[in-house]
């Protein structure tokens, strides 16, 4: 996944020109006939989105997501409340615009020429490519030419349908596919994971997030090059909303807020390691349950799952772990650090976790106050790994090379430079293995994402099992000993095949010749 960087100078110029052209309708709040005035009068910004880790996601009662945070800040910018509507698929999103049930769509949607004919795109803030995925162990397709509607299913309204049509017309005449009129991309990825589908197509960022929890999903083919992601709003003569969106993104860039959000949600990208992720998730099932109470006990204001991810990166949750340099235990503490924290046994799980948590808190307290709150943890982790002094050197080097020393995105790019002699000779604290600190922090972020997503999946499975159990009638001991002549389970199948047919009612897929969008 490659970030699509906005030409903010161009956006600024376009914003000014557009504002000048729209001067009769600005200030936006003065006239009831324009979109901004209508939003102000209503007192809420109506945004439709999709439920996904990147766009909008409920994690333990807290809503997170790149598009959610951007939409919330845009609502604040307009001085109104945010009203979010979550839809199941992309077609339903555009239906909301068509039916005037939404002011804009913020859902990681890709810009293309077909969509721009009917809807107004906003600025682009990252990019994705569309990819065919399959399940590890299944048959991997080697070319698009072999795919047919018995194998490949895509979500309704998906931008890739236009690309598939073009490929069919120009290159692969036998290419065909199904469109499931109900299920979104995430649900189709689940079906591939569960071996109910052979292949589907999703964007590279969605796949990257999904693989952190389900490593058995693998990329088979690239369908497209990088495509810009944007918001969409209604397309008509009233351009006040699109002008406001342009101005908002321009101000977000100038303040550095957009860069921080991109780093928060997109900065952990990189090559996916199937073996490492699978090993981690197996350890979550087999080892973490014994350690989780300790992580929860000593995490304090740190997310316990982040503390657990740090420990896995340090020791793979091995209390007896010892490195060639002499650091030991679950949190791999040095002897001097352990003594300063009053620890007597670094291989004792509770002592190691409590000591590591306190040491990390100390590092966070030392991070300069100018660093944004949500990024302080990454600076602290770099200091935890290579030492606080070298973290200060990395900040100083960032400032000298015209970067922002308070931006983790800028600082982490300079970390590998700390091992280059022409540069570290000019730094206060000299040589450091900055490339290791970079990998250290990035790995922890990936483990945290995997852990959060995996635990959420397990909670959903438990909830689903309870709902299924509650749907069956309760049988008393008396009824067991004196069964009625009429079965209390009237829908029990008469054969194994019949059971499958009755208990797996799957909505039919529809083969389409021409997608609606």
UniProtKB/Swiss-Prot annotation:
Domain of life of the organism encoding this protein: Bacteria
Presence of the UniProt keyword Membrane in the record: yes
Keyword Membrane assigned: yes
Catalysis: reaction(s): Exolytic cleavage of the (1->4)-beta-glycosidic linkage between N-acetylmuramic acid (MurNAc) and N-acetylglucosamine (GlcNAc) residues in peptidoglycan, from either the reducing or the non-reducing ends of the peptidoglycan chains, with concomitant formation of a 1,6-anhydrobond in the MurNAc residue
Location of the protein in the cell: Cell outer membrane
Signal peptide: 1-32
Gene Ontology terms, MF aspect: peptidoglycan lytic transglycosylase activity
Pfam family, one: SLT
Region (Non-LT domain): 33-269
InterPro entries referenced in this protein's UniProt entry, alphabetically: Lysozyme-like_dom_sf (IPR023346), MltF (IPR023703), Solute-binding_3/MltF_N (IPR001638), Transglyc_AS (IPR000189), Transglycosylase_SLT_dom_1 (IPR008258)
UniProt GO BP: cell wall macromolecule catabolic process; cell wall organization; peptidoglycan catabolic process
UniProt EC number: 4.2.2.n1
Top enzyme category: lyase
Active site: 314
Reported function: Murein-degrading enzyme that degrades murein glycan strands and insoluble, high-molecular weight murein sacculi, with the concomitant formation of a 1,6-anhydromuramoyl product. Lytic transglycosylases (LTs) play an integral role in the metabolism of the peptidoglycan (PG) sacculus. Their lytic action creates space within the PG sacculus to allow for its expansion as well as for the insertion of various structures such as secretion systems and flagella.
Name of this chain's protein: Membrane-bound lytic murein transglycosylase F
Gene: mltF
